[in-house]
């Protein structure tokens, strides 16, 4: 492999890498945030969850602000670099569909923000864990409907393109 081909190979692989990060983040959210709704923690969770979520959101929002747009940008760039090669290998449609699934993640933004707002405000009072359970269900659905298919498409695209 020549040094000239290396940047193109890396470009082809990067959407698979960033979508792996997105999918891993969704899994981490589910595993970590799901702890708050365990029966043994419910009472303290109802008291502490709003402050924890508000503080935590400031710490992990950089992933949302940086990684997701990078994932979208890499998907788009791949569609415009070496288009003939992508068509010949059949990777073009996989990158396109992967990008669409990845962008579909943002279709859940209003629902996610509404549920996060309820958690931060401690709604319903005395049972905020029910709002967390609602957010967790939405997050699981979003990951299975958008993030996992995007990852599958980007990995398939990279395998075809490389």
Swiss-Prot record:
Subcellular location(s) of the protein: Membrane
UniProt keyword list: Glycoprotein, Membrane, Oxidoreductase, Signal, Transmembrane, Transmembrane helix, Virulence
Keyword Protein transport: no
EC number: 1.14.-.-
Keyword Signal attached: yes
Entry membrane topology: Multi-pass membrane protein
Residues bearing attached sugar chains per UniProt: 127, 139
Gene Ontology cellular-component annotations: membrane
Recorded GO MF terms: oxidoreductase activity
Protein name (database record): Epoxidase pydX
Annotated TM spans: 62-82, 89-109
Similarity-based family: Belongs to the epoxidase xenD family.
Organism name: Acremonium sp
């Amino acid at each position: 492999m020549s040094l000239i081909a290396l940047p193109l190979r890396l470009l082809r692989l990067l959407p698979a890498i960033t979508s792996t990060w997105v999918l891993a983040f969704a899994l981490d959210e589910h595993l970590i945030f799901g702890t708050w709704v365990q029966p043994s923690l419910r009472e303290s969770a109802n008291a502490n969850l709003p402050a924890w979520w508000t503080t935590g959101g400031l710490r992990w929002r950089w992933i949302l602000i940086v990684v997701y747009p990078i994932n979208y940008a890499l998907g788009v760039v791949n569609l415009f670099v070496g288009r003939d090669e992508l068509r010949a290998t059949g990777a073009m449609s996989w990158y396109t569909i992967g990008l669409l699934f990845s962008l579909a993640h943002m279709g859940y933004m209003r629902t996610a923000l509404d549920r996060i707002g309820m958690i931060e405000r401690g709604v319903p009072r005395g049972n905020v864990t029910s709002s967390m359970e609602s957010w967790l269900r939405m997050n699981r659905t979003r990951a299975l409907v958008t993030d996992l298919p995007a990852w599958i498409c980007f990995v398939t695209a990279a395998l075809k393109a490389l």
